[in-house]
C-alpha cells in the first residue's frame, strides 16, 4: 500500500509523489503541464513570484494498492491521459 499526493498549480496537476514503507518517489508530469501552467499564470495576470507561488498546493494524501514506484507511475500515466487540452 502506498500513500500519494498530487501537486497542483490551481487546478492543473504538475507532479505526483508516492511513498510506502520502503521507498518514496516523485515524478513530474509531461512538460506540457508546466507550459500550460505558465500560460495560465500569464493569462490570469499572476506575474509576481509571490502570486505565482501562492497558487501551488498538494492534494490531501490518499492510499492506493501497490508500491510507491508503481503508484507514482500509474498516477502520472492517468493524469497525462486525462488532460484534454
Task: Enumerate the language-model features and the residues they cover.
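Short, charged/polar N-terminal "headpieces" of proteins
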Residues: 1-24
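Acidic, aromatic-enriched beta-alpha/helix-loop junctions
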Residues: 21-58
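Acidic, low-complexity intrinsically disordered segments
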Residues: 45-85
Amino acid at each position: 500500500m502506498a500513500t500519494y499526493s498530487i501537486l497542483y498549480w490551481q487546478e492543473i496537476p504538475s507532479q505526483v509523489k508516492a511513498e510506502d514503507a520502503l521507498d518514496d518517489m516523485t515524478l513530474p508530469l509531461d512538460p506540457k503541464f508546466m507550459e500550460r501552467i505558465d500560460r495560465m499564470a500569464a493569462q490570469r495576470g499572476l506575474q509576481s513570484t509571490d502570486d505565482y507561488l501562492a497558487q501551488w498546493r498538494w492534494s490531501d494524501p490518499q492510499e492506493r494498492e501497490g508500491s510507491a514506484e508503481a503508484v507514482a507511475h500509474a498516477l502520472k500515466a492517468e493524469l497525462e491521459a486525462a488532460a484534454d487540452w
